[in-house]
Amino acid sequence: MPSISIIVPVLNEATCLDSLLVQLKDWRNDRDEVIFVDGGSEDASRKMILAAGFRLIKSEPGRAKQLNQGAMAAKGDVLWFLHADSDISEISRESFLSLAHNEGFWGFFKIKISDKALIFRIMAFFMNCRASCTRVATGDQGIFVSKSTFIEVGAYSDIKLMEDIELSC
């Protein structure tokens, strides 16, 4: 059974970290790991992560740099990239591994926006349709990839925006 490395880039995310920190406690086990990569937070982000007992790596700012640094430090067979405001409450290790096995070397989850306003439900619907039809994913969708494939494709490009879309193309 493959091991999973969950990688979360952070930069001043204290206002949205609480929920993810609680959810990630369920992912602690002998095989898997959670790595937060901080790009120079000036708020309580680092303190919160360390108080929750998670691994924290310091990095230069820039999401691609942070994601790549976390990936290179990761020990898992599968890399799962999350955002600090991700909601993984409905994803179990078993369901994750089932999807990862079915998708092959990489994949993503449907986006779920917590705001129930109609406009956000419409946005989520169209983002999920686009991703399903084109296989182009955003980081909000929890991209996962085997570590060997990630290295083979050259990791995330060091660009300021859309590094997630570039990786999935």
What spans do the regions from the language model cover?
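Cell-envelope/extracellular polymer assembly enzymes that use nucleotide-activated donors
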Residues: P2-S5, E33, E166
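Acidic helix N-cap motif at the loop->helix transition within catalytic regions
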Residues: T15-S19, D43-A51
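Short, acidic, metal-binding catalytic loop of nucleotide-sugar glycosyltransferases
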Residues: V22-R31
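A conserved acidic beta->alpha catalytic loop
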Residues: D38-R46, S86-D87
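Glycine-rich, basic loop-to-helix element that forms the pyrophosphate-binding segment
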Residues: K58-A74
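Short aromatic/hydrophobic "clamp" motif used to bind/position activated sugar donors
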Residues: L79
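Conserved donor NDP-sugar-binding/catalytic core segment of glycosyltransferases
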Residues: I91-I119
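A short, conserved alpha-helix in the catalytic core of glycosyltransferases
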Residues: T149-V153, I159-C169
